[in-house]
Swiss-Prot record:
Disulfide bonds: none annotated. It comes from Lactuca sativa (Garden lettuce). It is an enzyme of class 7 (translocase). One of its GO terms (cellular component) is chloroplast thylakoid membrane. GO terms for biological process: photosynthesis, light reaction. It is found in: Plastid, Chloroplast thylakoid membrane. NDH shuttles electrons from NAD(P)H:plastoquinone, via FMN and iron-sulfur (Fe-S) centers, to quinones in the photosynthetic chain and possibly in a chloroplast respiratory chain. The immediate electron acceptor for the enzyme in this species is believed to be plastoquinone. Couples the redox reaction to proton translocation, and thus conserves the redox energy in a proton gradient. This is NAD(P)H-quinone oxidoreductase subunit J, chloroplastic.
């Protein structure tokens, strides 16, 4: 089943894949990493001016990594804002996705957290570095194949 936004993207020749609807009726679309930045700009111009959240997850051990964006279209006088969920999948060996920081500035810390926990590199992000783990941390703690170290020494702050 194709939703309103998916039909609009098809009409304008923008490549994507419809993943259906979630339990709240929000349309979910898959966008290829190479197309994501240009489609993000188009969605912003189309009215999806609010990035509600961004997160990432490990799809399966040894499989793809996913970056998920929840966008909202807020219009004056509209009874209900339109929402869409965008999923961008990246290969585990070199997970690179274009950053949308220059489209939605609120994604700054969220993309940094996804980088820190899963190792997804967001190209053209102005400050892509660890945000939760120490800079010296090795590995990506939320990957399903991550092996936690037996010991990690926290240095004294003095």
């Amino acid at each position: 089943m194709q939703g309103h936004l998916s039909a609009w993207l098809v009409k304008h020749g923008l490549i994507h894949r419809s993943l259906g609807f979630d339990y709240q009726g929000i349309e979910t679309l898959q966008i290829k990493p190479g197309d994501w930045h240009s489609i993000a700009v188009i969605l912003y111009v189309y009215g999806y001016n609010y990035l509600r959240s961004q997160c990432a997850y490990d799809v399966a051990p040894g499989g793809l990594l996913a970056s998920v964006y929840h966008l909202t279209r807020i219009e004056y006088g509209a009874d209900q804002p339109e929402e869409v969920c965008i999923k961008v999948f990246a290969p585990r060996r070199d997970p690179r996705i274009p950053s949308v920081f220059w489209v939605w500035k609120s994604v700054d810390f969220q993309e940094r957290e996804s980088y820190d926990m899963l190792g997804i590199s967001y190209d053209n992000h102005p400050r892509l570095k660890r945000i939760l783990m120490p800079e010296s941390w090795i590995g990506w703690p939320l990957r399903k194949d991550y092996i936690a170290p037996n010991f990690y020494e926290i240095q004294d702050a003095h």
